[in-house]
């Protein structure tokens, strides 16, 4: 059994620090990936008044062996009031940047793309100055579904790569590495004003060279932002941690990513795809993009 090193130990969140955020979420009957996926940074993020909202219910139609979100083949129908409730949470929390993600909903014809668009539009009506990041599923490769999200014009579209190609069958059996790259490439080709983002987990048996190869593949499709963090086994029934990656290697990946041209490169043991996502606002100021002033791929 691999022993968790000291650099991965975080203080348990205290009620007074996270209570206000939890009260808002409970009052508005909203889910967060922070809670559903047992994120180790929940205390820090809730203390700062930030959260990553999980839309379309707490149950997923896929059963990825690394993920702590519950599986259901046929989850509940979508709630038409969810977009407005989410927007009210953003208002009550005073968020300048919001991250919206979802479970996979392969039971829906559009994979939930329209619900993403409705949530984006609701937040924009209530908090027009808030920047919006969406962390989306692959929609089973549907270009039409992706177009629905793009048409809502979030500032950032994130789709996580999760692991290296060699490990996809074991780690992400219902995903496809090529489909992930194609999704990111399509976003950039159709709406170059939208920043694209992806994330990787380390410690599942990948090599340093394999991670660098994935980073190069992501830059080849003009991915702007990359996060890399340590995989942590949520429960004994989930995939085991093969290795706890030293902080020095995360730092090497960070420097390598900057050298490859990622506009933002976040790599550390506790990094998660939405960790300190609000920092993307600095990137937007230094590399501004608007629909009327689209940038060609670098």
Curated annotation (Swiss-Prot):
Binds 2 [4Fe-4S] clusters per subunit. One cluster is coordinated with 3 cysteines and an exchangeable S-adenosyl-L-methionine. [4Fe-4S] cluster 1 binds at residues 34, 39, 45, 274. It is found in: Cytoplasm. Its main location: cytoplasm. It holds the Pfam family Radical_SAM. Residues 277-298 are annotated as: Disordered. One of its GO terms (molecular function) is metal ion binding. Keywords: 4Fe-4S, Cytoplasm, Iron, Iron-sulfur, Metal-binding, S-adenosyl-L-methionine, Transferase. Its cofactor is [4Fe-4S] cluster. Residues 46-263 form the Radical SAM core domain. Its EC number is 2.8.1.8. The keyword Ligase does not apply. NCBIfam families: lipA, PRK05481.1, PRK12928.1. This is Lipoyl synthase 1.
């Amino acid at each position: 059994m691999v022993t968790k090193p000291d650099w991965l130990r975080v203080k348990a969140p205290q009620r007074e620090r996270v209570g206000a955020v939890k009260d808002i979420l409970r009052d508005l009957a909203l889910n967060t990936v922070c809670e559903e996926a047992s994120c180790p940074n929940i205390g820090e993020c809730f203390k700062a008044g930030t959260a990553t909202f999980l839309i379309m219910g707490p149950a997923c139609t896929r059963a990825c062996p690394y993920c702590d979100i519950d599986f259901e083949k046929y989850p509940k129908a979508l709630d038409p009031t969810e977009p407005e409730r989410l927007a009210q949470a953003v208002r009550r929390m005073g968020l300048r940047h919001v991250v919206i993600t979802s479970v996979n909903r392969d039971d829906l014809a559009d994979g939930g793309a329209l619900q993403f668009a409705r949530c984006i539009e609701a937040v924009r009506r209530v908090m027009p100055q808030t920047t919006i990041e969406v962390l989306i599923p692959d929609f089973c490769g549907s270009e039409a579904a992706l177009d629905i999200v793009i048409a809502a014009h979030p500032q950032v579209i994130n789709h996580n790569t999760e692991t290296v190609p060699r490990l996809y069958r074991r780690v992400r059996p219902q995903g496809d590495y090529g489909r992930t790259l194609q999704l990111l490439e399509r976003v950039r080709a159709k709406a170059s004003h939208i920043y694209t983002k992806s994330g990787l987990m380390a410690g599942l048996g990948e090599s340093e060279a394999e991670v660098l190869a994935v980073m190069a593949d992501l830059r080849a499709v003009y991915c702007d932002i990359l996060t890399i963090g340590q995989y942590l086994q949520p429960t004994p029934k989930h995939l085991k941690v093969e290795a706890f990656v030293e902080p020095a290697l995360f730092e090497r990946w960070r420097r390598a990513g900057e050298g490859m041209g990622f506009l933002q490169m976040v790599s550390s043991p506790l990094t998660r795809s939405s960790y300190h996502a609000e920092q993307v606002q600095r990137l937007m100021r230094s590399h501004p993009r608007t629909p009327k002033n689209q940038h060609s791929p670098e």
